[in-house]
């Protein structure tokens, strides 16, 4: 093609009109001859296609950011272009992102982060001394006294020490070893990392991972990615989403026919279900794990989000140690926490940690090796995690303001949890269990037979159809229960309770009006 074009250009010099035409004609003929000799080749097949890609990645689904969220993005763009809708904004109630919903950051955390990010501010009188003290300690532990340097793969040493001290305080003196602490890119990174080490075997010896249904879709996504076997155990919706050990026994016995159940995942407080497990339940689960030789994963990122006066958070680590050495020396446990939830709501920093106990020394080396492949978690996220576990204490300059802000966030969440539960339960065809903790409602919804048929005609799950209609008619984005798992024949959706109270009231009223109209339309 390049040669042909050059031949055509040759005829463009200064010539008489007649000679120019003959020259152009001659050049064009020669170019045509070249093209006949070297025909343009068709584009070759792409190396990476849906057929050739990693099938485990293709099997991954993550409902929290799935099709309905993509549709919400499309609608937002349409609103920006001036396309008329029955609403003026999309309310993203699909995800637990507190600050995106208007929650203000905790002042002390942002002060320390500002000081760590721009150390020249350490000379400013505008910052309290306790914030400066923490910032200096973090920076002194970083290479070059900068958050911009890599840390050790396991995390900054002094931050791991602070995490261990926090766990010891939280658990009433039960010791925590900094060497068992691994700082992570959010809790999700820790969960996927530990599962990578746990999954092995093939055929009937392939690792089975027990997860609650409903579950947080991270678990099913990682299980698919690792080509492990998902083993479902169902929470008891009729008993406030309680975990029943008899259901665990059923699940593990049935799974042994086709896999090797090796891992038991617990989410406490529950996501999406909002239940808080009793101490007795946790003891029963630990005994079951010991009995069946299961590795326990305790997802405890909502440990500060407990609202019911009748409930209290009990860490698996604390209960395990209080059950005595037969359990505390033998049951392998990884527990997880994060900067994203609680009262801090710092999702964007991607800070987290995992504590892993009773790990074989040789496996600990393998875990550190795996972590070293990604070098280290974001050092800014590690710093944010430090402030979560090492906040101001009584007698420090920032303590009163910090306490007010913390109590305000958690108090408002408790009010919104009760408001959501009460208003949903006033709507015919909606039932919502008590929201004991976390930051979501997971109401059960009645979907008429005609709506189920309409959903099938659109090749959608009935609750996806319901949630899509809710989005298109009200602008409210929630996640269908089918994305979390649910018992056959039941339908739910997950909705965050994070919007400000007045906006939450508006959301709940819109859901109520939509649901009543939906029932009438498909009666």
UniProtKB/Swiss-Prot annotation:
<protein>
    <recommendedName>
        <fullName>Alanine aminotransferase 2</fullName>
        <ecNumber>2.6.1.2</ecNumber>
    </recommendedName>
</protein>
<feature type="binding site">
    <location>
        <position position="338"/>
    </location>
    <ligand>
        <name>pyridoxal 5'-phosphate</name>
    </ligand>
</feature>
<feature type="binding site">
    <location>
        <position position="216"/>
    </location>
    <ligand>
        <name>pyridoxal 5'-phosphate</name>
    </ligand>
</feature>
<dbReference type="GO" id="GO:0006103">
    <property type="term" value="P:2-oxoglutarate metabolic process"/>
</dbReference>
<dbReference type="GO" id="GO:0005739">
    <property type="term" value="C:mitochondrion"/>
</dbReference>
<feature type="modified residue" description="N6-acetyllysine">
    <location>
        <position position="512"/>
    </location>
</feature>
<feature type="modified residue" description="N6-acetyllysine">
    <location>
        <position position="415"/>
    </location>
</feature>
<dbReference type="GO" id="GO:0042853">
    <property type="term" value="P:L-alanine catabolic process"/>
</dbReference>
<keyword id="KW-0663">Pyridoxal phosphate</keyword>
<keyword id="KW-0808">Transferase</keyword>
<keyword id="KW-0032">Aminotransferase</keyword>
<dbReference type="Pfam" id="PF00155">
    <property type="entry name" value="Aminotran_1_2"/>
</dbReference>
<keyword id="KW-0225">Disease variant</keyword>
<dbReference type="InterPro" id="IPR015424">
    <property type="entry name" value="PyrdxlP-dep_Trfase"/>
</dbReference>
<feature type="modified residue" description="N6-acetyllysine">
    <location>
        <position position="505"/>
    </location>
</feature>
<dbReference type="GO" id="GO:0005759">
    <property type="term" value="C:mitochondrial matrix"/>
</dbReference>
<comment type="similarity">
    <text>Belongs to the class-I pyridoxal-phosphate-dependent aminotransferase family. Alanine aminotransferase subfamily.</text>
</comment>
<dbReference type="InterPro" id="IPR015422">
    <property type="entry name" value="PyrdxlP-dep_Trfase_small"/>
</dbReference>
<keyword id="KW-0007">Acetylation</keyword>
<feature type="binding site">
    <location>
        <position position="271"/>
    </location>
    <ligand>
        <name>pyridoxal 5'-phosphate</name>
    </ligand>
</feature>
<comment type="function">
    <text>Catalyzes the reversible transamination between alanine and 2-oxoglutarate to form pyruvate and glutamate.</text>
</comment>
<dbReference type="InterPro" id="IPR015421">
    <property type="entry name" value="PyrdxlP-dep_Trfase_major"/>
</dbReference>
<feature type="binding site">
    <location>
        <position position="350"/>
    </location>
    <ligand>
        <name>pyridoxal 5'-phosphate</name>
    </ligand>
</feature>
<comment type="subunit">
    <text>Homodimer.</text>
</comment>
<feature type="binding site">
    <location>
        <position position="188"/>
    </location>
    <ligand>
        <name>pyridoxal 5'-phosphate</name>
    </ligand>
</feature>
<feature type="modified residue" description="N6-(pyridoxal phosphate)lysine">
    <location>
        <position position="341"/>
    </location>
</feature>
<feature type="binding site">
    <location>
        <position position="187"/>
    </location>
    <ligand>
        <name>pyridoxal 5'-phosphate</name>
    </ligand>
</feature>
<keyword id="KW-0991">Intellectual disability</keyword>
<dbReference type="GO" id="GO:0030170">
    <property type="term" value="F:pyridoxal phosphate binding"/>
</dbReference>
<dbReference type="GO" id="GO:0042851">
    <property type="term" value="P:L-alanine metabolic process"/>
</dbReference>
<dbReference type="GO" id="GO:0009058">
    <property type="term" value="P:biosynthetic process"/>
</dbReference>
<dbReference type="GO" id="GO:0004021">
    <property type="term" value="F:L-alanine:2-oxoglutarate aminotransferase activity"/>
</dbReference>
<feature type="region of interest" description="Disordered">
    <location>
        <begin position="1"/>
        <end position="25"/>
    </location>
</feature>
<comment type="pathway">
    <text>Amino-acid degradation; L-alanine degradation via transaminase pathway; pyruvate from L-alanine: step 1/1.</text>
</comment>
<dbReference type="InterPro" id="IPR004839">
    <property type="entry name" value="Aminotransferase_I/II_large"/>
</dbReference>
<dbReference type="InterPro" id="IPR045088">
    <property type="entry name" value="ALAT1/2-like"/>
</dbReference>
């Amino acid at each position: 093609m390049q040669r042909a074009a050059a031949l055509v250009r040759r005829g463009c010099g200064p010539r008489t009109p007649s000679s120019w035409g003959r020259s152009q004609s001659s050049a064009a003929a020669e170019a045509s001859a070249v093209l006949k000799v070297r025909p343009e080749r068709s584009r070759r097949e792409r190396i990476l296609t849906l057929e050739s890609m990693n099938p485990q990645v293709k099997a991954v689904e993550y409902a929290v950011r799935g099709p309905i969220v993509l549709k919400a993005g499309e609608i937002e763009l349409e609103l920006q272009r001036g396309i008329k809708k029955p609403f003026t904004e999309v309310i993203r109630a699909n995800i637990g992102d507190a600050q995106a919903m208007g929650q203000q950051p905790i002042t002390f955390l942002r002060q320390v982060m500002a000081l760590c990010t721009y150390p020249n501010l350490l000379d400013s009188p505008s910052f309290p001394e306790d914030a400066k003290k923490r910032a200096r300690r973090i920076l002194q532990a970083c290479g070059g006294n900068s958050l911009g340097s890599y840390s050790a793969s396991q995390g900054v040493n002094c931050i791991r020490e602070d995490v261990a001290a926090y766990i010891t305080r939280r658990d009433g003196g039960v010791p925590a070893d900094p060497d068992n602490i691994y700082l992570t890119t959010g809790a999700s990174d820790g969960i996927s990392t530990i599962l990578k080490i746990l999954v092995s075997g093939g055929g009937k010896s392939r690792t089975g991972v027990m997860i609650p249904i409903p579950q947080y879709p991270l678990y099913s996504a990682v299980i698919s990615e690792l080509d492990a076997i998902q083993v479902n155990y169902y929470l008891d919706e009729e008993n406030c989403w309680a975990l029943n050990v008899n259901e665990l026994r059923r699940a593990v016995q049935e799974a042994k026919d086709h896999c090797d159940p090796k891992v038991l995942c617990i989410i406490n407080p529950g996501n999406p279900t909002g239940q808080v497990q009793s101490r007795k339940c946790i003891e029963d689960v630990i005994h079951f794990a010991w009995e069946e030789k299961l590795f326990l994963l305790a997802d405890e990122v909502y440990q500060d989000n407990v609202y019911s006066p009748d409930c209290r958070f009990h860490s698996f680590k604390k209960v395990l140690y209080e059950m005595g050495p037969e359990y505390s020396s033998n049951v392998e446990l990884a527990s997880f926490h994060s900067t994203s939830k609680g009262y801090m709501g710092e999702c964007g920093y991607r800070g987290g940690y995992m504590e892993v106990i009773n790990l074989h020394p040789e496996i600990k080396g393998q875990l550190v090796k795996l972590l070293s492949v990604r070098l280290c978690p974001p050092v800014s996220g590690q710093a944010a995690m430090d402030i979560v576990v090492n906040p101001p204490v009584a007698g420090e300059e920032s303590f009163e303001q910090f306490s007010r802000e913390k109590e305000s966030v958690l108090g408002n969440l408790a009010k919104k949890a009760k408001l959501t539960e009460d208003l949903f339960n006033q709507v015919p065809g909606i039932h919502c269990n008590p929201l004991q903790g976390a930051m979501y409602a997971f109401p059960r919804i009645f979907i008429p037979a005609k709506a189920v048929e309409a959903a099938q005609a659109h090749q959608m799950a009935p609750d996806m159809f319901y949630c899509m209609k809710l989005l298109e008619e009200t602008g409210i984005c929630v996640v269908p229960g089918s994305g979390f798992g649910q018992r056959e024949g039941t339908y739910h959706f997950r909705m965050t309770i994070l919007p400000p109270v007045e906006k939450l009231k508006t959301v709940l009223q819109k859901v109520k009006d939509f649901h009543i109209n939906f029932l009438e339309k498909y009666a």
